[in-house]
Amino acid sequence: MASLTTLKNTAIVTGSFLSGAMITLSTITVPVLLETSTHPPQLLHQWVRTYHYGHISLPTISIATAILYFYIAAYQGAREQPWRKAALVGFLTIVMVPFTWIVMSSTNGMLFGLEAGNRDHSQFFEQGANRSGLKGANSSQSHGLGNVSVGIGVEMATLEGVRELLVRWKWMHLVRSLFPLMAAVLGVGICV
């Protein structure tokens, strides 16, 4: 079994890595997407793929890191040593998961919905629906943030709306990234 010091150091390193990986999504990846994508379906698809790959690894790292901190808290508590700080650090590391469900799910849902709608209807437009006059029927009518109706119940994302949603997501994600960063900073204190 690894020593307690090794577990503490591992938790700090994984938490720091987690926070760094998350912060780069808001400070590098999303800004690059916003600056280089001028076609809403492409921008949405790139965000969905970025989210997919982040979703595979980042929550897992968060949970594994929190488990390390909770183990440290239990170990120290069983030996009548200070344990609350380790438990708090574990909580701060894992709180990004419920933060996503509570704070970000609405924006995530809008982005996923727009991407799915654009994907589902792209074939319709590629097959000549625009040439048949369907797009002009009510193309200026807005139906919520990020999309516009283009006839017969089909909604397509606008670039301005998608960008607005991604900027909102970027800031919420940056806030979410601060939880494991705070945990890593506080985690250093449990190693001394």
UniProtKB/Swiss-Prot annotation:
GO terms for molecular function, please? monooxygenase activity
The protein's name is: Anthrone oxygenase
Q: Which residues are glycosylated?
A: N130, N138, N147
Q: Please give the organism.
A: Emericella nidulans (strain FGSC A4 / ATCC 38163 / CBS 112.46 / NRRL 194 / M139) (Aspergillus nidulans)
**What biological function has been recorded for the protein in this entry?**
Anthrone oxygenase; part of the gene cluster that mediates the biosynthesis of monodictyphenone, a prenyl xanthone derivative. The pathway begins with the synthesis of atrochrysone thioester by the polyketide synthase (PKS) mdpG. The atrochrysone carboxyl ACP thioesterase mdpF then breaks the thioester bond and releases the atrochrysone carboxylic acid from mdpG. The atrochrysone carboxylic acid is then converted to atrochrysone which is further transformed into emodin anthrone by mdpH-1 and mdpH-2.
Residue ranges crossing the lipid bilayer per the database entry:
12-32, 54-74, 86-106, 172-192
Pathway noted in the entry = Secondary metabolite biosynthesis
What is the protein's major site of localization?
membrane
